[in-house]
Amino acid sequence: FTMIGRKGLDLKTWEQFNDPNIRISVDAGSSQDQVATRLCPKAQISRFKTADEAAAALMAGRVDAQCIVMMLSLTMTKKNPNLGNVIIPTPVFATTSNAGFRREADKTWRDYVNTWIEFNKGLGLIRSVIVKNMELVGISEADMAGITL
């Protein structure tokens, strides 16, 4: 998870964001909302219907930062550099990607997909797909400083 901080905001840790004087926007009910609520309970958290509305609050100066996943924060700030700076608060707090399957007695399909994912992660395919897709929107691996894919 990252924060897009307003220009001039020089915070580096989750503890620094966990301050009653810091205003954070999130999209309500999202994983960003859960992380900000858990790691920054002292901060003023503003919840919006969408991530776009949370970004608009940042652009308007109504909040100091927006909590959002890295892939989105990099894309958003690449498209609109005036939005703010991407901050990867420490300690790094990451999320997993998940897929849901209908519960079935026969677990063959689920096990096949899990095996396929692990095999392709081991080959570096998942990483290369992420890097190539981010390059399509102008983001290089160098832009993902501090994060190992």
Where are these regions (language model features)?
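Short helix-initiation/N-cap motifs at beta->coil->alpha
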Residues: 10-12, 46-60, 95
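Paired acidic/hydrophobic, glycine-rich loop segments that form the ligand-binding mouth/hinge
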Residues: 25, 64-69, 85-86
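Periplasmic-binding protein-like
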Residues: 1-7, 70, 74-117, 136-149
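Ligand-binding clefts/hinges and TM-proximal coupling segments of bilobed small-molecule sensing domains
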Residues: 31-48, 87, 117-149
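Short helices/loops that flank or line small-molecule/ion binding pockets
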Residues: 15-16, 38-39, 52-71, 79
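Short, well-ordered beta-strand segments
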Residues: 4, 23-26, 66, 100
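Flexible hinge/capping segments at coil-to-helix
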Residues: 5-23
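Sec-exported extracytoplasmic/periplasmic mature domains
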Residues: 8, 22, 41-44, 59-63, ...
